[in-house]
Amino acid sequence: MNAQDNTAPAKEDRAALDRTGEGGCPHTCSKVLLAAFSRPPEVRGEDVNAAIVIAAESVAEHPGLKDAAQYFGPVSGAAVAQGFEVVEEPYEFVVGTRTVVRGDFQKDVGSRVMLQSTLVVLARGYAVSFTFIGGTADEVEELVQGLSFVAGGKAVK
């Protein structure tokens, strides 16, 4: 999920993506649904490895969780544990016809800065997070602008 810090092995980078890794949340409460990178996490590069990570965690794992903004306690905790600092406290953000909650983080990686924006929505008993990582604000915004929601309909049988 993160730009490759030449001192950190790729296994640790993958564990950062999935809080279900060792020392994190058990596999029963959090799942990474999608992790997409500009290049494979094992491949070192000069620039930040842009990424999109979609994860879902059962709301039942967080008693009292009533809105997406409250989920930023765990989100911020995970980001800070990975060396990020909060740049923008959680705020409402409109994506198409849906309002989500967004928080922004940054981390120095050698001579580069890694930016992370995480958007959260509560849906069907899950806290669903969309995390976008890039090396510039423009790169992150371009990734965020690619997110859209469509109205759910009845399943076709």
What residues fall within each predicted segment?
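Secretory pathway targeting signatures of secreted, lumenal, and periplasmic proteins
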Residues: 2-63
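Short acidic, Gly/Pro-enriched loop/turn segments at secondary-structure junctions
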Residues: 2-14, 68, 139-140, 155-157
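Short amphipathic alpha-helical surface micro-motifs
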Residues: 16-20, 31-39, 67-72, 82-88, ...
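Extracytoplasmic/periplasmic, Sec-exported soluble proteins
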Residues: 46, 63-67, 135, 139
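Short, well-structured beta-strand
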Residues: 49-51, 74-83, 87-157
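Long, charged/polar, surface-exposed segments that mediate recognition or autoinhibition
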Residues: 55-77
